[in-house]
């Protein structure tokens, strides 16, 4: 089973289409070189062909993450390629973050930031494209890459993309080639091994940050949180909190999107939605405890999702939203400390920071605020 993240399949299709365009024979597998690694991986390609009398090419791949419940599983990827004369193929950057020889277009089904219209694509995905396409681009040419995900918009409607300000399709935000199975025992084991390794390093200062999923990782890096302190946790937050305390962590920061962390404020410490949800119920409880009006509490309780409830509240009563999320951040810290002390006596300080649908840090508990302020970061008001 080829368990690779969506960016890998995108790059494989782009590389296959480029090979066809420059006269190479079609191969049903493409070798993909990885950033900062000597080895490469073999990625299956469904088809590839020349278009417009050889002026353009198209290749198709199908994302296979290996996860039955993964939203990207089976997604069809179309990569259109076209070469143009006149580029120096220098390594200079342009505004969208790509070198000047690579003209990247997010086609139908690829997520874009609502605020700017720019494609939602991670640095890993950008680097992967550059590393694998640059050797194939003839000297003096530039390459236009257009990626289309025919089912992308429909698939994205089942995700929390809009909560991050991403619209029109699926994000290309993987930070590594291999899929991490966020709800499996193996993923918990891997996270514990990473945690143990970080805590065993001579330079370890007792501080760690748990980020939740790819969006959390992407934002943590953009905000400049210390990379050597970051662990992407997936869904096994409870056992990892305890493991952090056992391994001598003094200050722990929980950094992520409210859609995951809200569960901690309700005492749910395995956050995969197929195992435990209850987010609307937790949100309703938080609103009640903050003294929000009954009409708004009823609105929350009848919402189809946390995101829909928040969007409605932001329009009708933005002050209520701020009260609810501030309460949530505080409850996350309280419930997390209580969870850890259920298993061992620990003085580990646990802070929480939540970001909003515009990808801004907006809410924090008291400890979370102290920790980000010590890094020179402030909350968006």
Swiss-Prot record:
The gene is cbiD. InterPro entries: CbiD (IPR002748), CbiD_sf (IPR036074). Keywords: Cobalamin biosynthesis, Methyltransferase, S-adenosyl-L-methionine, Transferase. This is Cobalt-precorrin-5B C(1)-methyltransferase. Pathway: Cofactor biosynthesis; adenosylcobalamin biosynthesis; cob(II)yrinate a,c-diamide from sirohydrochlorin (anaerobic route): step 6/10. SUPFAM superfamilies: CbiD-like (SSF111342). Its EC number is 2.1.1.195. It catalyses: Co-precorrin-5B + S-adenosyl-L-methionine = Co-precorrin-6A + S-adenosyl-L-homocysteine. It comes from the Bacteria. GO terms for molecular function: cobalt-precorrin-5B C1-methyltransferase activity. It holds the Pfam family CbiD. One of its GO terms (biological process) is anaerobic cobalamin biosynthetic process. It is an enzyme of class 2 (transferase). Belongs to the CbiD family. NCBIfam families: cbiD (TIGR00312).
